[in-house]
From Swiss-Prot:
Stretch list, region Disordered: 43-71
Annotated family: Belongs to the TatA/E family.
Bilayer topology term: Single-pass membrane protein
Alphabetized UniProt keyword annotations: Cell inner membrane, Cell membrane, Membrane, Protein transport, Translocation, Transmembrane, Transmembrane helix, Transport
GO molecular-function terms, A-Z: protein transmembrane transporter activity
BP GO terms, sorted: protein transport by the Tat complex
Organism, scientific name: Xylella fastidiosa (strain Temecula1 / ATCC 700964)
Name listed for the protein in its UniProt record: Sec-independent protein translocase protein TatA
Superkingdom classification of source: Bacteria
Length: 71
């Protein structure tokens, strides 16, 4: 008695479409999708400087390169 059936959800969906319209819902879904894409992109950008920092510290840890051919 407390759960909703599929018919109830379809009625709610139709009412939402009538109130907001398909264009507003499509624009809202597009905005949410682009926000998620930007969020994932920022997560990957945060990882890149850490990797680059680790590779530069390894090259400086080996010390300066000496040229033994010239005296």
């Amino acid at each position: 008695m407390g759960s909703f059936s599929l018919l109830h959800w379809l009625v709610v969906l139709v009412i939402v479409l009538l109130v907001f319209g398909t264009k507003r819902l499509a624009n809202g879904a597009k905005d949410i999708g682009s926000a998620i894409k930007e969020f994932k992109k920022s997560l990957h950008e945060d990882d890149k400087p850490t990797d680059q920092l680790g590779s530069t510290s390894q090259s400086t840890a080996s010390g300066p390169q000496q040229d033994h051919g010239k005296h």
